[in-house]
Amino acid sequence: MITKKDTLPASEAYTLLDDTGFIEELTAASVLSGKSEVQARKYARKCLIEMAATPSESWLAPAARFARFIYTRSYEKKLDINTEVLQELHELSRDNLLLFLWSHKSHMDSFAFLVSLYENDFKPLPLVFAGINMNFFGFGTLARKVGSIFLRREFHDDPIYKLVFRHYIDFLIRNRLPLTWSIEGTRSRTGKLSPPKLGILTWVLEACERQDMQNVKFVPVSIAFDRIAEIDDYVALQQGLPKRKESLRWFMNYVFGMKDPYGKIYVRYGEPVSIGDVDGALVNGDARGLASTEGAGDGPSLATRVAFEVCTHIEKVTPIKAADVLTMVLLGADGRALSEEEVYRQARKIAQLVRERGLPLAQGFSLEGLQQVSAVLLSMRGSKLVREFAKGRVPVYYIPDDRQIAAAYYRNTITHYFLAAAMGEVALAIGASDISVTREEELRDRVECLRDIFKFEFFFRPKDEFFAEVLQETSRRYSDWSGGKTSLKKQLRQSPPRFGHAILRSIAEAYYVVAVVLSELGEEPVTDAKRFAADLLQPGREMLLRRQISGESSISSDLYATGLQLAQHRGLLIPDGQNLAAGRRVFLDEVYEIVTAINLLQSNYNRAWFTS
């Protein structure tokens, strides 16, 4: 067992270049790369200099001031942190190597995360894995001095770089140096937690095994914002516009462009995950389709299981904010405006449900009073997310078409809390026309079909556990759904839905666009899924104009990409001994059934709120 007194600081990483074992492996790698041994030694040193962090204690205080200067240009200085959990982690770090994996919503994430540790005297600060694209002039030097490790995006075909990185990771793990990185790899453009990137996690797990590092804890960290500084960029990317390249000029424009007040930043630490916690995990669950990448019969890899547990733990501590709830309510109104009273009546019920379930809340969360809802609406108007029309009988509020994708981002940050209820509503709506009474087995079959359709969108818990929540939430709203005393159609009218149409409509409609266009191709293969997803934006626009889909939030290259991922998983892009046209038609029928069910939910909602 390696103890802390045996360890070296991160600045001593260059000693690995003189290690006998490394030199022997470098000789073999030089042959594969076509370099002489001298060239290989020189290139290996260059690779290590490029990637290695050079942290210095004297740089931490000025770096923390710099980080605060950046995020406080728009956000409140005081971070909302669950400090009691952070204190427990401080105690845990004495006997365990802590690896922090955080959600990635904004460029502000790493600044807020490191300040949350620094200001609470958490030492040593973890070294941060970052993309080489952030190693631009000026910023890269500072970041390296406070512990940034810069990695190339692709290095699979570079045997020397891979060798250096493997030995560098071994050095970090062997010397018990805490590490941190974004489990998503890149910023979420939709608001939902993105599928985890397994690259760094796999390297770290393999290093832990090689170094026999037993006491390792993966710490999930949720970083959330009242408002996202980059929200307009995310909307543009979903609409097919190119991503802006990072540079010093870009960084300066980004920082000094932050002028409006964006509210609070929330840093919430979750329950640590150990390797032992994930043994046998995912046997009955889905990891946003990650298991589909594993070899047949092998089951999910250790990295997949760890990533899934970390992501679900992040979701469990993500705070629910008042504006997130109101965007869900307003987006569920089918493009119509709601009065303040109507928003309040719907939001109050959701707030009561949230408190009953004991879900994590942002500090100051309150929607139980009309005055509180009014204040949130005022704030959302200030952010141009919501508009008011006050020249009629009563003032009404709505999300304009060009802000639907932005509003959907905030709604999506909390949809996982209401997913079981949403799927229960859709499953009931699918069977609403049946003459026979819906039984529990039928409901479960429909829910599992919905899980399979949306497997690349959400992190689903094991099937039995998830369906138990579906039953609980469905029975909470529709107590006689399986009793037969009242038809499902009547029950859905009497108790209008809350979540199915509000959460799943944009995804289902985006998949409908994918399915329609694929079906029209017949047997024609799709060889470039990325290009095809971008090309779907125009058919999506056409279908919106023809009212085959309902709103702008269904026209999203990100949603089209996950829809195509599902189609690819089902073998519907390239012929592989099956009839593509027939398979695509079945896919279209499945998605159309879901869209039809959601339309039924929407019509019942509209009847309840817009029929005088």
Positions of predicted regions on the chain:
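Membrane-interfacial terminal anchoring regions of lipid-handling membrane enzymes
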Residues: 1-612
